[in-house]
Amino acid sequence: PDEQEKTEPWRNYVTCLNDHLAGHNPLIGREMELERTIQVLCRKEKNNPLHVGEPGVGKTALAYGLAARIEAGNVPERLTGCRIYELDLGNLLAGTQYRGEFEKRLKAIMEGIRKEGHAIVYIDEIHNLIGAGRTGDGSMDASNMLKPYLEGGEIRFIGSTTYEEFNRYFSRSRGLVRRFQQIDIQEPGIEETIHIVEGLKEKYETFHGVIYEEGVIAYAVTAAAR
């Protein structure tokens, strides 16, 4: 990867989720939301899912869960071999103080990803695209610069944002709303939360060097819900 970053500088601004699965907990539950995401990605048009939910409900975990499904080969043929690249918007904006500098950098990233083929771009807190890179004098922001790639179909996008930021920023960009399919990510219920934590129990026991007694997780989840 380091050699690739030297020859392909656009890789400095993205993280390939497929290559970073080992450091993340597996996605447990959320089958309905993940299936809906896959269905949208397989469409011919409006094939860019937008995960909208409160902070902490697991929107980013869904992107990693999809990457894991792709690596396991458990996806439709249209998604087989796809790579999910998370765009680092903060790094992308850093040091771009001159007009045209941001546009040039973003275009280089998108062209690099397009040439890779079978690419999906994941943008966490996608509402930050609106206004990003705009320097005045009629210059475009990132959301406008991405529209040709959103329309072209060669690159698919997954975005995530909160309801508050969606209503405040994203919903006002008609072009983005038209190109993304909203998928609501609700907070899991008590039963689903217990199922999720039970699935992660062994990892936490190993990390903390403890053994959780039977019933402790159900009690903790129920008490937290209250």
Predicted regions and their residues:
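Conserved catalytic/switch belt of AAA+ P-loop NTPases
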Residues: 41-43, 107-111, 123-156, 162-175
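Loop/turn-to-beta-strand initiation segments
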Residues: 47, 83-84, 114-121, 152-159, ...
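N-terminal pre-P-loop "Q-motif" helix
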Residues: 5-10, 25-37
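Walker A/P-loop nucleotide-binding motif
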Residues: 32, 43-65
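Post-Walker A helix-loop "phosphate-sensing" segment adjacent to the P-loop in P-loop NTPases
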Residues: 67-80, 92-93
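Conserved C-terminal "switch" segment of AAA+ ATPases
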Residues: 76-77, 120, 167-175, 182-226
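Conserved ASCE P-loop NTPase core motifs with emphasis on AAA+ ATPases
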Residues: 2-21
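Short glycine-rich substrate-engagement loop in P-loop NTPases that contacts/grips substrate
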Residues: 85-114
